[in-house]
A protein has these predicted regions:
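Terminal, low-structured helical/coil segments at or just beyond the last alpha-helical repeat
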Residues: 279-309
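Amphipathic alpha-helical repeat scaffolds of TPR domains
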Residues: 79-84, 115-132, 144, 169-191, ...
Length: 309
């Protein structure tokens, strides 16, 4: 392990001894091999100190080269992997964590072209944290910003499905779970503020246009979300047409019919909307493609519910 002594020359290039130069700036105890290095600790260091430490590990860091090369990467971990290929890095053990986390911190500080995968992963988690605090609006704001980054990457790399994007995204997250949570959160907010239905429509339309080869359950989920948003905005004809199109593609998708009818039940308590919902449920019952008895029973229950209220 590379150990920096107090009397060694400071890696910042000043020519001074480490104890007389940057020792007080470095809040991390690099000399303790048992001490873990955390991202929050590195964020507290100034840029000069971070770069000095990278140079100490024999990484010939150059501002202009770093900024120019960022466009070739999406992950700070992948960037640091290439440093290991290019330089004879002396970091060992827990010190190796410093390398990729330093790349992440410098990425955030020195460029605003795009967020790295690690930052996007953290923002997605931050959105979930906001949801746990019942701050749905902040969660949506964070997540829609992340989606914009993903859109740029999808267009640049030519991905056609969410599965393709997930394979290249450096994270343990399942993007399919996050995508459906984002869509549902926009819908829930739309029930309180109709502007969010417009955001839901835009998100759903972007997803379907950019990632049309995603798995069927995602196409179904996002398509019904778009159609439902139109109905709640009062554009019922457009919403109905979109439900009809998705059900033409998936004729035995019972829950597509149920979700369609439910939107009219949720709109208001008017007799006309109840009749509309009943017509949709009965349309599904008349559909010869729906054969499962459990699905048929659910539809019959829905018909009884609207008839009795």
């Amino acid at each position: 392990m590379a150990v920096l002594g107090r009397n060694d020359t400071c890696p910042c290039g000043s020519g001074e001894k480490y104890k007389k130069c940057c020792i007080d700036k470095e809040k991390l105890n690099f000399e303790d091999p048992k001490k873990s290095i955390y991202l929050e600790d590195i964020k507290k260091l100034d840029t000069h100190t971070i770069i000095s430490r990278l140079k100490y590990y024999r990484i010939d860091f150059n501002f202009d080269e770093f900024i120019e090369n960022i466009d070739n990467y999406y992950s700070a971990a992948n960037l640091s992997d290439d440093w290991y290929q290019k330089y004879q890095i002396t970091a060992d053990g827990r010190e190796e964590d410093f390398i990729w986390m330093a790349a992440w911190v410098l990425w955030n500080r020195l460029t605003d072209s795009k967020d790295c995968d690690e930052e996007l992963d953290e923002k997605i988690e931050e959105g979930y944290n906001m949801l746990s605090k019942n701050n749905q609006e902040e969660a949506s704001s964070i997540w829609l910003d992340v989606w914009e980054d993903f859109k740029n990457r999808i267009e640049k790399e030519g991905h056609n499905s969410l599965e393709e994007l997930n394979r290249v995204f450096e994270s343990d997250l399942f993007l399919s779970n996050w995508i459906t949570d984002l869509e549902m959160n926009l819908h829930d907010l739309g029930l309180k503020n109709k502007d969010y239905f417009k955001k839901q429509i835009k998100f759903c339309r972007d997803f379907l246009n950019l990632l049309p080869e995603s798995k069927d359950y995602l196409i179904q989920s996002i398509s019904k979300g778009e159609a439902a948003a139109y109905i709640h905005l009062g554009e019922t004809e457009k919403g109905d047409i979109k439900f009809e199109r998705i059900l033409k593609k998936y004729p035995n998708w019972t829950w597509g019919y149920i979700y369609w009818g439910d939107q009219y039940v949720l709109l208001d308590d008017s007799a006309s909307n109840k009749r509309k919902a009943e017509q949709i449920y009965k349309l599904a019952l008349q559909n010869g493609d729906i054969k499962k008895m459990e699905d048929i029973d659910i539809l019959k229950d829905r018909v009884k519910e609207v008839a009795n209220h």
